[in-house]
Amino acid sequence: MTSLPVLLFLIILLLPSMITEGRVLTQTGKEATIFADQKTNHEADLKNPDPQEVQRALARILCALGELDKLVKDQANAGQQEFKLPKDFTGRSKCRSLGRIK
């Protein structure tokens, strides 16, 4: 049952950042640099996110949560007391290519 709080925490933590990925201001609060081939209204994107991007972000989160849940169960079955996330977990994840946001 400890995996459920971890999963909920990851959803709450990752969802806002995945939806607005690449569309936020820097820490100084200055407007982000816009390249010549990037013609987007960032404020409009933040107010009205593209439903497809939201769907892709949710698909990536659900995929990652499924992999994390499987990893937790595998470690529990192996009798490990501590949860140890492999260093290359994010690099080898099947979810990286799933629903890639522009």
Curated annotation (Swiss-Prot):
Changing C95S: No neuron activity in the VNO. The keyword Amino-acid biosynthesis does not apply. Disulfide bonds join C63-C95. Pfam families: ESP. GO terms for molecular function: pheromone activity. Residues 1-22 form the signal peptide. Gene3D superfamilies: ESP1, core domain. Keywords: Behavior, Disulfide bond, Pheromone, Secreted, Signal. GO terms for biological process: positive regulation of female receptivity. Changing K70E: Reduced neuron activity in the VNO. Male-specific phermone which is recognized by the Vmn2r116/V2rp5 receptor in the vomeronasal organ (VNO) and enhances female sexual receptive behavior (lordosis) upon male mounting, resulting in successful copulation. This is Exocrine gland-secreted peptide 1. It comes from Mus musculus.
